[in-house]
Amino acid sequence: MTASHSETPSTKPDASTFISDHLQVDRSKLSQMYLHYVETKDKYPHAVLLYRVGDFFECYFQDAVKLAQELELVLTSKQAGEQGRVAMSGVPHHAWERYATLLVEKGYAVVICDQVEDASEAAGRLVRREVTRILTPGTLLEEGMLKSSRNNYLAAVVIAANHWGLAYADISTGEFLTTQGSDLEHLTQELMRLQPSEVLVPTNAPDLGSLLRPGETSPHLPECLPPSFCYSLRSQVPFSQGEARPRLLQKFKVRSLEGLGCDRFPLAVRAAGGLLEYLEDTQKENPVPLQRLRTYTVTDYLIVDSQTRRNLEITQTVRDGTFHGSLLWSLDRTSTAMGGRALRRWLLQPLLDIKGIRARQDTIQELMENTPLRQDLRQLLRQIYDLERLTGRAGSGTANARDLVALADSLSRLPELSHLVTESHSPFLKALQKVPSVLEELAQKLHAHLVESPPILIKEGGLIRPSVNPLLDERKATVEADQQWIANLEVDERAKTGISTLKVGFNKTFGYYISISRTKADQVPANYIRKQTLTNEERYITPDLKEREARILSARDDLNQLEYEIFTALREEVAQEAEVIRNLSRAVAAADVLCGLAELAVHQGYCRPEMLSGREINIVDGRHPVVEQSLPAGFFVPNSTQLGQESLVSSHLSLADNQEQITNTSLREAAPTTTLSTSDQGQMTNDNPDLIILTGPNASGKSCYLRQVGLIQLMAQIGSFVPARLAKLGICDRIFTRVGAVDDLATGQSTFMVEMNETANILNHATSRSLVLLDEIGRGTATFDGLSIAWAVAEYIAVDIRARTIFATHYHELNELASIVPNVANYQVTVKELPDQIIFLHQVQPGGADKSYGIEAGRLAGLPAVVIQRAKQVMGQIEKHSKIAMGLQNLD
């Protein structure tokens, strides 16, 4: 059967003339093909069904309408038997991946129902079709459907009261991990870190199998799950302990889950088992070769919540969501796709383990000091393709011949890598020193069997080199002889007819034919049989040509089938070595990341931070890693930071414990009634604070300084060198930021309410080992309200939490806090004030500022001169008469 795409479609068909819902049809009146379509659609009611008909994949009924609307295609109709016409839309079969990708990106699941036999084999019956692929956002494998620089995670969650289990996998790379926790906020943050393309949720919802697109809601979706992901509602049965545990044992061929590290995490086991069942359901005959399940604990890593990732612009910018201008952009010097993904994972999951951090630092230092090794490694790494995903496609049976050639090219580079790092002492480089001989042999075999530049399609021949298989060579000789017979026929027929433009052609519909221009039709011999008339030519056949055609096509089919069998055998050999290849590919990825970080450190002048077990943050001449690269060399003004000295904390605790001077309670009671002159405030600067009150003009660089400290700490905990002259850094358990705020219209929250929610999260979760970066707390409400909240927040962090904190503010009254809380210090971003302007020096120095120069910032921004002049007049009046200028003196 072939698609009737020759029908003239209407771009705006009258919906009343065809049926657009498969549930409304009388199935007894449908033709065989449409009945099969409807029965298949019944099994996948929530997916878009692409149904192969000849050279097209077609959609009918409601899926046709959906396809046409979402991809802006023509919606037409086709006759479906006695039932009448039904809605139809379609795409060419050779381009199905592109259209399916667009649908998946929009949050749809796509079912591929393909023809599994040639139409010629059907012999008058319905061509056999089967579901061969189910594509969902989290189960993509094809290269064109994936972003090389990031993982494509499928996640599964199980929630029981406040406890939760999470499993996630990237089937394109084989990664498979699981974890469990007792704080739902940690689950939310893990999902935000992973950014899974799809999340499986067990439920008793009536619409099981449905896929909720981002932003769609369901009463069956737990409230703690962020609305920004695709959610698949699944049956609870595969997520039960009784089904999940045996499935994991069978998958990994183990007798106990103890070896996988998840035997004590029942919710994690349930999530992992449910995820495996989903892969079995969607991947059909293409089992996914997952790596061995790994179990981890969220609190084993530095926690960076979604707000902090956004504010620090770790993977994308706040302004326009682009990669360029992010921390990842500034650090990424990787040479492979695997390395790029690994660097992204490292940034989103920094280490707490000092030993692990130092091991990475040692490797970077070795590569910095050995320039020839670093340069040779980078040059060789550029020649290695994406081993992880190439292996994944081979293991799932979707790799083509070009994939295997790329894999062979990459594997053949590994012995060279091994030779380069022979003398290295780094555990990361030592992992490359021994390449299993089986991989070298596999690369040689692939190169020996596959042609250098094979076609994309794997069932149409042209894949295998000569002399690989005697039977293949014999069949190739037969086909070549047939091709020569065709060439000779063309020459002979030209001579017989005297028609010099005569050609012998071929297409899949008519087979071989003789083409003659219509102007020469009167010269056609009597034994020619007209087969087709076109605008400028006539096409003919002869009995001899048709007789030979059957032999030619049969021989070519036999040849193509044998090539396909040889190719699939090679692909299966690759799949058998998937675990070995992936183990080595992880080593390549880590080496690539560290090599890139070494290159970055050399060219940007980074230093090796000394990692400490205490709370100290001591940065000398630190620089913002992104802003620095965006400015001409030497333009960035470095600044130092000192926080969290243990000696001061011990002294402070001693004072509080002995109640000799100031207790925590007395601090809060004394604060409102204690006042200093502005000049005194500027002098109250402790040398080793836990909390810095940072004041200074608008646009002077306070926010940049805050982010700079956070980014340096984060970089250090992934093992990177940092942009500073010197750095001594204690390990942080969490980095919190509250920088800027906007209205959350979706939840009806004002800017101030968003700010308070973020601040509450920090106060409720920060510890003495956290780093807190606050910018402008309390500015979204009345002045005294905001000042009061800002004071109370700063005081609580300094006294009760003792987190290392930088608190940027325009409330200069907060400088008074340093006079009564010993672990608070005042710092300011300085300016040079001239008679008619100010010059921002961008230098952070001890002392508190007493002006914000907001009017000057307005002038620089282009406010009209008359507005600037009036603002100065109003300010003069306020300073003379308003109680605002009196600070905290009368708050009691």
Swiss-Prot record:
Q: Does the keyword ATP-binding apply?
A: yes
Q: Which CDD domains match?
A: ABC_MutS1
Taking the record's annotation, the residue ranges forming a coiled coil are none
Positions of ATP binding = G696, P697, N698, A699, S700, G701, K702, S703
Q: Is DNA repair a UniProt keyword of this protein?
A: yes
A single BP term in Gene Ontology: mismatch repair
**What keywords are annotated for this sequence in UniProt?**
ATP-binding, DNA damage, DNA repair, DNA-binding, Nucleotide-binding
Q: Give the highest taxon in the source lineage.
A: Bacteria
Q: Which Pfam families match?
A: MutS_I, MutS_II, MutS_III, MutS_IV, MutS_V
GO molecular function per UniProt = ATP binding; ATP-dependent DNA damage sensor activity; damaged DNA binding; mismatched DNA binding
List the residue ranges of the region (Disordered): 663-684
Q: Which GO terms describe its cellular component?
A: cytosol
Q: What is this protein's function per UniProt?
A: This protein is involved in the repair of mismatches in DNA. It is possible that it carries out the mismatch recognition step. This protein has a weak ATPase activity.
Q: Which family does it belong to?
A: Belongs to the DNA mismatch repair MutS family.
Identification of the protein by name: DNA mismatch repair protein MutS
Record organism:
Nostoc punctiforme (strain ATCC 29133 / PCC 73102)
